A protein has these predicted regions:
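Ferredoxin-like alpha/beta domains used as RNA- or RNAP-binding modules
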Residues: 1-103, 130-204
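Short, well-ordered loop/turn sites that connect or cap secondary structure elements
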Residues: 115-116, 135
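Beta-rich strand-turn-strand
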Residues: 106-109
């Protein structure tokens, strides 16, 4: 099975669109894989553990990170002062690859991760090739000038108008640069997940 088809299958299983292709497919077939129509209803109430596991999987796949990374983020969120769920949101959303995606420079989170790893992204004018690199308020994330003629970035530039930046990001005049103005709130993040369930899962 191709990666694209696997992402579609995972999207249907978890009821989240991980890619644009998955979103279109789910519009046509809004039910899990293995079921042959919307008329089939699954019976039985999901246990607390299964709910927590499901939300953890949904969150991990939306940010395209490994289980070990997610566990570390959750544990740090609990140890840090403040609301653990809010802490988790901010830690994940301030990752460099997440901000490349939110800024509209990539069509998917995996693509954003790849762009960073391949050295196409700068933070405050310096190349950074670590997708998990934390970005701080005031930092500017940008596509390198030498990379802006790559078709993927040309396409992203053409589609920026249709993809408004979230309120905690400010797109700069050149289009392929954005500033993190502040840390996001849970309500502002475009992620389909009950963050509190994820915290509960790792607190077991």
């Amino acid at each position: 099975m191709s990666i694209a088809n696997l992402q579609v299958k995972l999207s249907r299983k978890l009821n989240i669109a991980l890619t644009p292709k998955a979103s279109k497919y789910m519009d046509r077939r809004p039910y899990p894989p293995g079921e042959h129509g919307p008329q089939k209803i699954r019976r039985g109430k999901m246990s607390d553990y299964k709910q927590q596991l499901l939300e953890k999987q949904r969150l991990r796949l939306q940010y395209n990170i490994r289980e070990k990374q997610m566990r570390n983020y959750a544990r740090k969120a609990v140890r840090k002062s403040g609301n653990p769920a809010d802490n988790l949101v901010q830690a994940l959303e301030s990752r460099l690859d997440a901000l490349v995606y939110r800024s509209g420079f990539a069509h998917t989170m995996p693509a954003a991760r790849q762009f960073v790893s391949h050295g196409h992204i700068q933070v405050n004018g310096r190349k950074v090739d670590i997708p998990s690199c934390p970005v701080l308020p005031g930092d500017v994330v940008a596509v390198k000038t030498a990379s802006r003629k790559i078709p993927a970035f040309v396409s992203a530039m053409e589609e920026l108008v249709a993809r408004p930046a979230p309120p905690y990001l400010e797109r700069l005049e050149d289009g392929l640069s954005a500033r993190l103005t502040r840390m996001p709130t849970r309500e502002e993040v475009r992620v389909d997940c009950e963050f509190s369930k994820v915290i509960e899962y790792y607190a077991r």
